[in-house]
From Swiss-Prot:
Belongs to the long (4 C-C) scorpion toxin superfamily. Sodium channel inhibitor family. Beta subfamily. SMART domains: Knot1. InterPro entries: LCN-type_CS_alpha_beta_dom, Scorpion_toxin-like, Scorpion_toxin-like_sf, Scorpion_toxinL. It is found in: Secreted. The lineage of its organism: Eukaryota, Metazoa, Ecdysozoa, Arthropoda, Chelicerata. This is Beta-mammal toxin Cv3. It comes from Centruroides villegasi. GO terms for biological process: defense response.
Length: 66
């Protein structure tokens, strides 16, 4: 599974500036999911890869980013 990492409180994606390989996104994806997850910056948000099927990613139901 793949998807944008999301803030559970406000429903927003984790923003990033440096597109492509990005240490911040990789670190956040691994902290949120697990150490074998991958992550990079895509369309100015952190995209996580190699996730388990039940991983919660953007968009969250009934939550809009404010």
């Amino acid at each position: 599974k793949e998807g944008y990492i999301v803030n559970y409180y406000d429903g927003c994606k984790y923003a990033c500036v440096k597109l492509g390989d990005n240490d911040y996104c990789l670190r956040e994806c691994r902290l949120r999911y697990y150490k074998s997850a991958g992550g990079y910056c895509y369309a100015f948000a952190c995209w996580c890869t190699h996730l388990y099927e039940q991983a919660v990613v953007w968009p969250l139901p009934n939550k809009t980013c404010n």
